Amino acid sequence: MVENHGVPLATVEIDVKNGSFTQTPEYEGLAHMYEHMFFRANSAYPEPNQFWDRASDLGAIFNGSTEEERVNYFMTVPTENVGNAIQLLASAVQHPLFRQDELERERQVVIGEYDEKESSPFFALDQAMKTKLYPGNFSRKNPIGDRRIVATTTPDKMRTIQNKYYVPNNTALIIAGDVNPTTVFSLAEREFGNWNRAADPFIADPIPAIPPLQKSEGVIVEAPVGAVTIEIQWQGPSVGQDPKATYAADVFSDVLNDPQSQFQQRLVDSGLWQAVGVNYYTLNHTGPITISGQTSAEQLRPSLAALYGEIAKFDTPGYFTSDELEAVKAHRAVTSAFDRERASGFAHTLGFWWSVASLEYYMGYVDYMAQQSLGDLRGYARKYIVGKPHIAGVLISSDERQSLKLAPDDLVMAGAR
């Protein structure tokens, strides 16, 4: 529970440790499908649209999202309706009906979302990269899912997900905003107090570890695009196994993304790249490290060679400076403080970190970031990036690929030169 009396609103959020990371190929996309069914009929609101009508009566703004390692559902309401919002979400999480007629309608909605994503060439590149970066485990990194699985899912499969993952000991209730702690704890006890614990799903059925990437590969996706997009990915740290590296990863990315960094000056200010960015996505099951940007077809080979030249120096003393390090630490502390000012956004942030890592990890985040040294950044680069297997992808038009005589091996070979 987070008090914030800035405006007379409150956000009620439910987070579940579910998402694509729990999906075998037979369930690919069903964590997302379940998210859609959450806002449909339940035992307290058994008719179609009753849930939505009740939410409208409360003046609620509500939604959900499915990611790799978290599914969340939230509802922002005027303060006086927070108790009703808790009741509405409690009924949805504990007593869904999974009506066949609603399932059939929501299938089409989800397939429509898939079609929309599929129309983007960047989605095609993203999917191709994930397939190579996580061989044999694509279903666990694909929240949008498999169209065939979504189109043929049944209420029984929804019930299987509910019984396994939608249990109180795998769920967090977060309430943030203009609320009284005593009141909301009493309301939460009233609505959730009789919800019985179940077996820990990750003890009963442990999630297998993502196997290390064994070799570097190139990926080329052809589409009618103007600029050429280049993306290089590595398997990064898992927050549960190497939390220290995740702090170094964020500082590392911040330093390289600073427009004044040597990295940006040599790649972007030189004119080789139109833009280039570095990111680590924190996950408990092998988050990706990504360097991506855009250039022209004429500059593709020199741009890639220059990038690989920078990557080779990431673990070299002197590549990062103390001034760069302290500047990004201060900036991250300020932005983290600002992020906590908006109650609804803070609820989402807390839910993500509870699901992926822990609240203790999040509450110590700024302090641990501040402790990172130049040696920590070099150690992170040495352990996860420099000389490590990677996937290099390019999104390019067919004509430009043909003109360049570009082959997938060219993308990796550039890094070996």
Predicted regions, residues:
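M16/MPP (pitrilysin/insulinase) zinc-metallopeptidase core fold and M16-derived inactive scaffolds
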Residues: G6, T11-T76, N142-P143, N257-W273, ...
